[in-house]
From Swiss-Prot:
This is Flagellar protein FliO. Coiled coil: none annotated. GO terms for cellular component: bacterial-type flagellum; bacterial-type flagellum secretion apparatus; plasma membrane; type III protein secretion system complex. InterPro entries: Flagellar_biosynth_FliO, FliO/MopB. It comes from the Bacteria. It is found in: Cell membrane; Bacterial flagellum basal body. The gene is fliO. GO terms for biological process: bacterial-type flagellum organization; bacterial-type flagellum-dependent cell motility; chemotaxis; protein secretion by the type III secretion system. Belongs to the FliO/MopB family. It comes from Escherichia coli (strain K12).
């Protein structure tokens, strides 16, 4: 009688499915990041609104941690010097004249303009 059992080793698992899934995941993440950048770049992202009537209307960087900021308050516009340690009032301006509401553009017209600029229309 033959009491010897033969052990068969299975074929090594290939890395192709792992690479395929990893590639698809990286492509999806890149697509999400590109869409977020495009939304921010084209202005579809909601505008940041200030709290309690404060709105930053302009900002300029002067150094690594220094900025000059123009803040609209209810009855004045303040020019502030902002550093890492403190905020100083540089100048007080009269309130700005009310501006006309900028009409919201729809997605279709933005895409048409974008395609016209790239020459694909």
């Amino acid at each position: 009688m033959n009491n010897h059992a033969t052990v068969q080793s299975s074929a090594p698992v290939s890395a192709a499915p792992l690479l395929q899934v990893s590639g698809a995941l990286i492509a999806i993440i890149a697509l999400i990041l590109a869409a977020a950048w495009l939304v921010k770049r084209l202005g579809f992202a909601p505008k940041r609104t200030g709290v309690n009537g404060l709105k930053i209307s302009a900002s300029a960087s002067l150094g690594a941690r220094e900025r000059v900021v123009v803040v609209d308050v209810e009855d004045a516009r303040l020019v502030l010097g902002v550093t890492a340690g403190q905020i100083n009032l540089l100048h007080k301006l009269p309130p700005s004249a009310p501006t006309e509401e900028i009409p919201q553009t729809d997605f279709q017209s933005v895409m048409k303009n974008l395609l016209k600029r790239s020459g694909r229309s």
